[in-house]
Amino acid sequence: METEQQQRKDSVASAGSTRQLLAQMDVKATGSPSAMTSPGAASPATAQSAEDASPAVPYGGKFDPKAIAKKASARHQSPTVLGALQGRAAEKTAVSIAAPAKGSAASSLPQGKPISGFGFGKASNDDKVPTKRKLNLDDEEISKRKLAKLPDLSLETTDDAPYVNQDDDEDSDGDNFAGTEEEAAAAARAAHERREERILQQSMAMETDEANPAAEGQVNGSEPAVSSANAPEEAQAKPQTDSMDVDTKEDDDEVDPLDAFMADLTEPSFGPASKPVKTLSSAKVLPTPEAYFSDDDEFGASTKEGVDAKAIMAMAAKRKKKEIPTIDYSKLDIVPVRKNFWVEPYELSEMTEAEVAELRLELDGIKVSGKDVPKPVQKWSLCGLTRPILDVIAKLEYDKPTAIQMQALPVIMSGRDVVGVAKTGSGKTMAFLLPMFRHIKDQEPVKDNEGPIGLILTPTRELAVQIFRDCKPFLKTLGLRAVCAYGGPPIKDQIADLKRGAEIVVATTGRMIDLLAANQGRVVSLRRTTYIVLDEADRMFDMGFEPQVMKIFANVRPDRQTVLFSATMPKIMDALVKKVLKNPVEIEVGGKSVVASEITQIVEIRDEKSKFNRLLELLGELYKDDDDVRSLIFVERQEKADELLRELLRKGYGCMSLHGGKDQVDRDSTISDFKSGVCPVMIATSVAARGLDVKQLKLVVNYDAPNHLEDYVHRAGRTGRAGNTGTAVTFVTEEQENCAIGIAKALEQSGQPVPEKLIEMRKAFREKVKAGKAKDQSGFGGKGLEKLDKEREAARNRERKTHKAEGEEDDAEDDKKTTKNDEKTDKASSAILGAASAIVSRDAAKAEAEAKAAEGGSTPTAAATPAAGGKGGALDKAASAINEINARLARAGQLRPGQPIDNKGPDAGAFHATLEINDFPQKARWAVTNRTNVAKILEATGTSITTKGNYYPPGKDPPAGADPKLYILIEGDTELVVGNALSELTRLLKEGTMAAADAESRAPASGRYTIT
């Protein structure tokens, strides 16, 4: 029997590797002993014959090696297609149960060895490589399949393969299939795809190694087995179904077994690769690459490049214009608000018209115009105010209303629009604050992010702060919130206060525009604003703020109540009043533009040299009798204020200066120190002429005379407030004839004597005006924000730097556009486009130059000449200059200014380009020639960048025989690197040009005030 068995084995061996391959595949398909053993065991431990191995079978069934060998011989004589299995289920079960016992006793594989995709990790690996199951190369799957109910299988096919494999491969490892070189190559191709998966499978394999033997022991009963009996039904049936599908397909199509096996081996490579593809397909689509340098479009010549350059230059030459979104209230459902709170008291209803007229005459000559004007009140209790407001008034010790308050309070409380004109220090602020509090308390509370109900606009920051301080005593009692917004401090803090909600906003016009334009109008909303006050309205329009004021009014509800107050109201204001007010009531107390009678006015005609000594004399007389008094000195210009400050400090007077050139923090601290008496003397420009209320202020000196009446009235009105007395001294030089008209008129209206010399100066100036030699000045010459931009820019730059250092956001800027800036933008854009030449190949340039030379044109060096501003005439001049230089020097191979681009030096490249920088600003030239920027470009592109030519002033052409204009030569081996370098240099040139244009438009504050 042994001889017969040996012959059968030899016949199988002679069949070649293909037979072995088919046999091994059948072993895996029918459940070999190695497939049934533990993953930690080898297949057979020793090379034994079938007879020696049979007694070790633990079950009671009969094991006949002869029958198995006979069936194996019949199978090898007539081989079948892979998967064509026939037999009986009973015999298959017997053999499959017998094999595990043999293998389990000979387990020699280390337990701690990491298991690959063919081991315990196969369960998770099958999810990624489903085609592995079709090849039946996994031991665990077959062990699962033996527990399922199987169809009828051929006993011949099932039993012959294990013994052929056992006899041939005594040292085969049960965990790894002993295949051919083709299988090893296929496994190697798939190895790198499973490398990352094996790391994750190691932990899973160890857990499975501990769980599966215990589960298998429940099936065998006597000794532990490997296959899991508790596997889910789907996990057991699916490998079987997949295997059967493969078998059926191969059986039907009659595919060669080796081809089918090799095809299945290559399939797993698509399994793992499919997952990354799926991930990429579900990922976010990346932006499409854009070609910056293509063959179809030369650098600097495209229309798109031109548009971009213009846009960039436009941003530098003109700052972005603030646009306030306009609200169409006709399409909104506006909730009506109550504005009329006036109920005429019984005491007033009994008064006749004659008695009312007499009362108004007694109250400083109140003049009113309008229909149905309420009668003036004489007590706080008759004004219709709430009890909390009256309690605060009592705490502030306001005994009775002033003249303007007596008439303005009942008119405003009735919901009418009002124009109030009263002398300085007459209590105009309380005249519009008290009705505003009553107006706000009648409405629903303001929620977060809702706009204010009351809006107060002022022309200066100091006046805004003054009004805000007057509001504070009422805010806590009434439960209201107020925000003071003005330029200088960071806008971020003011926006945060507004978002928390505020019923009252006191703001300057420019900062209010900034807030309304911020974040496309979503920061501040004026939809709930129904009460607007313009304090010192004439000065606001005088400074040119009419467009800004009209923008603000366009965003407020049409049913608003508007109040205008000022100490002066020129006739030119009448037309502007009609634009913003509806049927207003005009109230005039003491006349328009009149200095209070409590103020003593002194006008002195003297030369410039004697002013300072006279000032020292006035200060000495003032502080001789009383130390706790204040004096205010007005000058015309900022530098004059600083100069006078130094002179007074040298004389021992503690003083401070106040003007628009100072930071807002300094301005606030100066006013605070002046009011508290730290510095009893303050030198200021007209910025302090309005809204400044200091009780101890006894002396006002106009060191430089004001040039119009309204300014004089407000300057003098800083003293003699609230019934107190004061003195206003004005110095007028003989050259200031234009100031004589306003000062003389103010003296006449207030009943003060007018000096004869001043009358003569006024007469002389009027004659000059009639003769056309002079122009009368009456105020309203301001240019608005456009004029103030340049004057404030230096201070804003300092503030911006301070905010950046403190982590603050940049302060919002007023954006305006001028025609001059537009012209600069167009010129700079065209210059940048024309300065960059196209990228030219060295060979092409030489060929073109030789062709021109053959035609009798220019020399070969002319082709290498940089373009001079993109003009042919300049190009010819540069070419002729280069030719003359080369002819004179007669030396080759030396790099020098004007040398042709197609040189043979070490830096010569196959491609080159030029960029002329001679006519650009100094900042732009420095940006493209400084060592740091050039080194970065050289490192990034690997090109050669050389600065050539000489600098010539704008408008001057190089003389004959001289070097060409300053330009940059870029050389490189490829067109791409030259284009990249040229693009980077052009970007730097644009940035430098933008910085220069922006610096030019931001001139210092008219040379008035600088910090050194």
From Swiss-Prot:
The keyword Nucleotide-binding applies. Keywords: ATP-binding, Helicase, Hydrolase, mRNA processing, mRNA splicing, Nucleotide-binding, Nucleus. GO terms for molecular function: ATP binding; ATP hydrolysis activity; nucleic acid binding; RNA helicase activity. A motif (DEAD box) lies at residues 535-538. It is found in: Nucleus. One of its GO terms (cellular component) is nucleus. Pfam families: DEAD (PF00270), Helicase_C (PF00271), KH_12 (PF23469). SMART domains: DEXDc, HELICc. GO terms for biological process: mRNA processing; RNA splicing. Residues 409-587 form the Helicase ATP-binding domain. A motif (Q motif) lies at residues 378-406. PANTHER family: ATP-DEPENDENT RNA HELICASE DBP3. This is Pre-mRNA-processing ATP-dependent RNA helicase PRP5. The gene is PRP5.
